[in-house]
């Protein structure tokens, strides 16, 4: 307050010092989720450690990438499965995506590969079996929990230890974000996830949107059946997903309104899309040499993400065929079997510096599975996309980018070699794609605070204030008929009907009186004339 009006640099320093001093160190519990989810959550955790907070990460001892070289206390618990089990189940899951795509809750529920989810759900049971660990957590008196809600465990931990929580997610499956945050999502223009609809839906799509919402209400709890059983067991009371999610203090959502469509939000939702974008670093020699050799045509970067390792052979050959028909050099991150028809402009690599390559001016296009990390790297660097979504939020991400003219979406199951070739030629040669993604890029980057700083601020806010109850809407305390004001509407309707009824009765009475008089007069008149 005292700083306003001062313009010399010295008071500015004082102000900065004051704001720094405000961030007193606290104690934070982190419950992460494995896989690509951890990539960005990790950057927030690292920054919180750097800022001097005492951070404890609780993770299963079997994992792909959790924990690695974090400079903080890491507590592991033993799991009921091995790394081989995890790999095998994930492979089965990824493999199934090449056969049929999940476009409804029903197909999600009926998926024959859902064992992977049950492995993740079982983590929490394992955590709470470790009595020493639970005792340690209880005695540590944390200020808050920072969690990825995917496997529910962080939500259960927050509730069990009665700690305020910060949820970190791209989105929440089913209707649990709307329910947990009490956020309205009108079905007329807010598409449900998995459908791949835009916000301008046809009548048929709006009908499908409603049915999807109904499916969520009817079927989602069955998808989370095992997770909820474990939660009820740990919390020793029957719990629903709503019970778990509605405990959340702050929602850190990895999206923004450059990627997503505008829609209603709540005051405890913070949008940190693009948190994974980094300043491009110089390229390793190997990749610089590929770019130098590509000449005036430049390069195309191709990656289906860290989670897809193998593509069915026929599909891989169709893709390789299309890649050979463009003049650009294609750098393809692929660890599966080398397609026999691979053209000489296509280079297979086991790994590539994706963000740095996308940041290079010679990069013409990005072929991606449209995972949110890749899409944001594309937005940040302004590279048009050819998108081949496979599962999760990817169909939706792709649709959003396509409707904004920043890329072309292909149905990976049905596309032919020509489709891919045409899509590539379109995004490379049609200037509008580049212009649109550059526009999105400048909109996305025009912001007062970097997403990483925003995320760190809100975690610290919850730690400082032991939650954010002032942001919690009173909607949580209402019954469903109160929320929709059905009782008020019913009451008012009753009043109006009663008034209408009484008025009608009075009029009818009055009318009858008048008529009666007239009638008698008439009658009297008649009898006189007789
Ligand atoms: C880890 O943190 C400690 C103190 O918090 C610091 O002294 C040390 O340099 C850090 N190590 C790394 C590898 O960052
Ligand atoms: C690529 O070209 C640039 C500019 O011509 C040059 O400075 C660089 O050394 C080249 N890199 C490689 C690996 O050939
Ligand atoms: C790639 O193959 C085509 C014919 O298939 C040939 O014309 C071209 O010279 C080859 N390029 C390189 C760099 O070997």
Swiss-Prot record:
Gene3D superfamilies: Glycogen Phosphorylase B
PTM sites of type N6-succinyllysine: 99
Subcellular location: Endoplasmic reticulum membrane
Superkingdom, taxonomy of origin: Eukaryota
Keyword terms, alphabetized: Endoplasmic reticulum, Glycoprotein, Glycosyltransferase, Lipid metabolism, Membrane, Signal, Transferase, Transmembrane, Transmembrane helix
Catalysis performed (reactions): glucuronate acceptor + UDP-alpha-D-glucuronate = acceptor beta-D-glucuronoside + UDP + H(+); 2-hydroxy-17beta-estradiol + UDP-alpha-D-glucuronate = 2-hydroxy-17beta-estradiol 3-O-(beta-D-glucuronate) + UDP + H(+); 4-hydroxy-17beta-estradiol + UDP-alpha-D-glucuronate = 17beta-estradiol 4-O-(beta-D-glucuronate) + UDP + H(+); 2-hydroxyestrone + UDP-alpha-D-glucuronate = 2-hydroxyestrone 3-O-(beta-D-glucuronate) + UDP + H(+)
Keyword field contains Glycoprotein: yes
Effect of residue 442 to I: In a breast cancer sample; somatic mutation
One of the record's GO cellular component terms: endoplasmic reticulum membrane
KW Transferase (keyword) present: yes
EC number: 2.4.1.17
SUPFAM superfamilies in alphabetical order: UDP-Glycosyltransferase/glycogen phosphorylase
Carbohydrate-modified residues: 71, 292, 344
Positions of transmembrane segments: 488-504
Subunit structure: Homodimer. Homooligomer. Interacts with UGT1A1, UGT1A3, UGT1A4, UGT1A6, UGT1A7, UGT1A8 and UGT1A10 to form heterodimers. Isoform 1 interacts with isoform 2/i2 suggesting that oligomerization is involved in negative regulation of transferase activity by isoform 2. Isoform 1 also interacts with respective i2 isoforms of UGT1A1, UGT1A3, UGT1A4, UGT1A6, UGT1A7, UGT1A8 and UGT1A10.
Additional note from the record: UGT1A9 isoform is part of the UGT1A complex locus which displays alternative use of promoters, first exons and terminal exons. The locus is defined by 13 first exons, which are alternatively spliced to 3 other common exons and 2 alternative terminal exons 5. From the 27 possible mRNA isoforms, 9 produce functionally active polypeptides (UGT1A1, 1A3, 1A4, 1A5, 1A6, 1A7, 1A8, 1A9 and 1A10) called isoforms 1 (i1). Use of an alternative exon 5 (5b) as terminal exon is leading to 9 additional alternatively spliced products termed isoforms i2 and which lack transferase activity.
Name the record gives this protein: UDP-glucuronosyltransferase 1A9
Taxonomic source organism: Homo sapiens
């Amino acid at each position: 307050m005292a700083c306003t009006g001062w313009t010399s640099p010295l008071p500015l320093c004082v102000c900065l010092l004051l704001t720094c001093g405000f961030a007193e160190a606290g104690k934070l519990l982190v419950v992460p989720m494995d896989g690509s989810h951890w990539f960005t959550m990790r950057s927030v955790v690292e920054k919180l450690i750097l800022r001097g907070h005492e951070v404890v990460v609780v993770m299963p001892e079997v994992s792909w990438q959790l924990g690695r070289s974090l400079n903080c206390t890491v507590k592991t618990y033993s799991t009921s499965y091995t790394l081989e089990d995890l790999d095998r189940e994930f492979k089965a899951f990824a493999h199934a995506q090449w056969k049929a795509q999940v476009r409804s809750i029903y197909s999600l529920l009926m998926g024959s590969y859902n064992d992977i989810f049950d492995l993740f759900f079982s983590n929490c049971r394992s955590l709470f079996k470790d009595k020493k660990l639970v005792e340690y957590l209880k005695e540590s008196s944390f200020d808050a929990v920072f969690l990825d809600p995917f496997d529910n465990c962080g939500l259960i931990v927050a509730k069990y230890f009665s700690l305020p929580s910060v949820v970190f997610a791209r989105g929440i499956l089913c209707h649990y974000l709307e329910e947990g945050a009490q956020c309205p999502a009108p079905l007329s223009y807010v598409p449900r996830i998995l459908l791949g609809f835009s916000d301008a839906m046809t009548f048929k799509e709006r009908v499908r949107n409603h049915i999807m919402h109904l499916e969520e209400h009817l079927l989602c709890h069955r998808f989370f059946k095992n997770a909820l059983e474990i939660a009820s067991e740990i919390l020793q009371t029957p719990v629903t997903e709503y019970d778990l999610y509605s405990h959340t203090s702050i929602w850190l959502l990895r999206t923004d309104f450059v990627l997503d469509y505008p829609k209603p939000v709540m005051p405890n939702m913070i949008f940190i899309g693009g948190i994974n974008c980094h300043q491009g670093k110089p390229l390793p020699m190997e990749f610089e040499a590929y770019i130098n050799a590509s000449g005036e045509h430049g390069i195309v970067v191709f990656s289906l993400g860290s989670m897809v390792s193998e593509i069915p052979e026929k599909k891989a050959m169709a893709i390789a065929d299309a890649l050979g028909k463009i003049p650009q050099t294609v750098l393809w991150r692929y660890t599966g079997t080398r397609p026999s028809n691979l053209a000489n402009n296509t280079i297979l690599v086991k790994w590539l510096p994706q963000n740095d390559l996308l940041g290079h001016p010679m990069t013409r296009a990005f072929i991606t599975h449209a995972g949110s990390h890749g899409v944001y790297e594309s937005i940040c660097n302004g590279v048009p996309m050819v998108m081949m979504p496979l599962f999760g939020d990817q169909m939706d991400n792709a649709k959003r980018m396509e409707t904004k003219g920043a890329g072309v979406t292909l149905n990976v199951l049905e596309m032919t070699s020509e489709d891919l070739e045409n899509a590539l030629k379109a995004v490379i040669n049609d200037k509008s794609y580049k212009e649109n993604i550059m526009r999105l890029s400048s909109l996305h980057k025009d912001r007062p605070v970097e997403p990483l700083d925003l995320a760190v601020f809100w975690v610290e806010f919850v730690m400082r204030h032991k939650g954010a109850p002032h942001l919690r809407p009173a909607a949580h305390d209402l019954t469903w008929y109160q929320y929709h004001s059905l009782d008020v509407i019913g009451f008012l309707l009753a009043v109006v009907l009663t008034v209408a009824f009484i008025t009608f009765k009075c009029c009818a009475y009055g009318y009858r009186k008048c008529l009666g008089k007239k009638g008698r007069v008439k009658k009297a008149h008649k009898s006189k004339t007789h």
